[in-house]
Amino acid sequence: MNQRIPILVYHHVYPDGADELNVNKPGECTGVIAESAFNRQMQYLADNKMEVVSTSNVVDWLIDDAPLPEHAVVLHFDNGWLDTFTVTKPVLDSFGFTATCFVITDSANATSEGKRAAIRTKTEGIVEKPFMTWDQIRELVAAGWEIGAHTASHCRMADKLEAEGDEGVLDEVDRPSAAFQEQLGRLPLHFAYPSGSRNTRTDELLQDHYRSLRLWHFEEQPVWSFTENTTSRLAIDCQNIDNTVTFADFERLFEEAVTNG
């Protein structure tokens, strides 16, 4: 039977009542979710015997047909925002869950040096917000999290290719790899495309540097996409989760995974 794996991608998890939750952009993702709503989603996973597995577990399944639990799910957190450490991690700890965090290394470097860091995002344009330090990222690793690459600067890789060619794209690979080696003593195994911006050439350039490349997309009315047995490791599919996703839609995601698997 074809198995379908939901990979849930989050950006910000904020405490209830936080000003940052007041985002209203009709037809667009917000990238934010309240802590209580996130906790409810994690409780749903626990209540329904969903087993949270790592990105590496899924890639082993895709490449080597390694076994996965029948009701596997993967949790991803993009960018390396500070709230991933201060808000998200305690919630996941309470359920015994771990996740993969895809970090922007220029931002982690700057924050670790006491400097401000700003990036351009699909949801907010240029924004300056707190990121994790490398010390905090190392605490995630110690807790069983995987850390993946998300470029050095959070650039759109297809645009980077058009503007700077292969050399520009590879710079967004080499700088994170150097930072990972220096700070974590290892190279990143997995990569997530910022804003899902990619093309065949970027895949070709990145495929020998990472075990997997993850996509990203958003639909106003969620159309769930799953990573399946036939999915390429260069096109790991996922679901964006934020406060535009109702709890009914969240439940439907898992119902579709089971029904159509």
Predicted regions and their residues:
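Beta-hairpin (beta-strand-turn-beta-strand) motif
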Residues: 79-80, 104-106
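A short alpha/beta connector and helix-capping loop motif
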Residues: 87-105
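C-terminal active-site subregion of NodB/CE4 polysaccharide deacetylases
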Residues: 1-76, 83, 154, 158-190, ...
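Acidic (Asp/Glu)-rich catalytic clusters
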Residues: 46, 90-96, 132-149, 206-207, ...
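Non-cysteine beta-strand/loop elements that form the S-adenosyl-L-methionine
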Residues: 102-103, 148-151, 215
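Alpha-helical scaffolding within the catalytic cores
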Residues: 59-60, 86-87, 124-142, 175, ...
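Aromatic- and acidic-residue-enriched segments that line the glycan-binding/catalytic groove
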Residues: 26, 95, 110-129
